[in-house]
């Protein structure tokens, strides 16, 4: 390769890397309100487009959640809250297994919750000034038909210290925090039987099939 060709390829590489970095920066600086709308639009449009497939196999909701919702969820932050003070005493291998299983459990929980969706309208609150806040709650109204009171959900978002990316770490509905409820359900097993047993039992719960309530 001669000097001219080398300079040409160097210029192309510089352009590609610059474009990549600009894209990453744009993603990191994207408002959580914008991300919330993006996630909701993709999630519910895919649910609507795949109704026949979902009715035939409700577990397909897990695939939709995995593809459309989990990329917006900070599983490591939420999972570390479940482990609490045990985090530092676990091995890298144990943590890897735990976070994988924890992600599958959250996937199952969200997919099961979405069996209650039946073409309701989703209304996300108007964007507020973020300021220097690294944590924010975003209210989402699920508008019901026939004048039934809307279902209020609050999605808790956190801005990563290093990445600068906003991600969800908890959802609150009817005054119940999914994260706190998860901690409450599993902390006893973690305290008494250790993380390996916790992982095994979480795997059992995560493998539960998605079912529609009759």
Swiss-Prot record:
Keyword Signal included in the entry's annotation: yes
Main localization (coarse): periplasm
Keywords: Periplasm, Signal
Coiled coil: none
Signal peptide coordinates: 1-28
A GO cellular component entry from the record: periplasmic space
Source organism, top-level taxon: Bacteria
Keyword Lyase: no
InterPro entries recorded: MlaC/ttg2D (IPR008869), Tgt2/MlaC_sf (IPR042245)
Record Gene3D superfamilies: Tgt2/MlaC (3.10.450.710)
Pfam families per record: MlaC
Subcellular location: Periplasm
Function description: Involved in a phospholipid transport pathway that maintains lipid asymmetry in the outer membrane by retrograde trafficking of phospholipids from the outer membrane to the inner membrane. May transfer phospholipid across the periplasmic space and deliver it to the MlaFEDB complex at the inner membrane.
PANTHER family on file: INTERMEMBRANE PHOSPHOLIPID TRANSPORT SYSTEM BINDING PROTEIN MLAC
Family indicated by similarity: Belongs to the MlaC/ttg2D family.
Alphabetized NCBIfam families for the sequence: PRK15117.1
Official protein name in the record: Intermembrane phospholipid transport system binding protein MlaC
Organism of this sequence: Haemophilus influenzae (strain ATCC 51907 / DSM 11121 / KW20 / Rd)
Gene: mlaC
């Amino acid at each position: 390769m001669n000097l001219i060709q080398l300079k040409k390829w160097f210029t192309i590489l510089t352009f590609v890397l610059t474009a990549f970095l600009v894209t990453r920066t744009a993603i990191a600086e994207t408002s959580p309100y914008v991300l919330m709308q993006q996630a909701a639009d993709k999630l519910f449009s895919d649910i609507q487009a795949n109704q026949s497939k979902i009715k035939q196999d409700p577990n397909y909701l897990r695939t939709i959640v995995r593809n459309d919702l989990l990329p917006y969820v900070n599983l490591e932050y939420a999972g570390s809250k479940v482990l609490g003070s045990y985090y530092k005493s676990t091995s890298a291998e144990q943590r890897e297994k735990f976070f994988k299983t924890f992600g599958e459990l959250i996937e199952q929980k969200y997919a099961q919750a979405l069996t209650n969706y039946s073409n309701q309208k989703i209304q996300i609150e108007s964007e507020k000034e973020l300021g220097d806040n690294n944590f924010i709650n975003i209210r989402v109204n699920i508008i019901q038909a026939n004048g039934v009171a809307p279902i209020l959900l609050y999605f808790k978002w956190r801005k990563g210290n290093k990445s600068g990316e906003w991600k969800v770490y908890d959802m609150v509905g009817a005054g119940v925090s999914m994260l706190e409820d998860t901690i409450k359900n599993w902390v006893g097993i973690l305290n008494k039987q250790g993380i390996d047993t916790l992982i095994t039992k979480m795997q059992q719960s995560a493998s539960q099939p998605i079912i529609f309530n009759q």
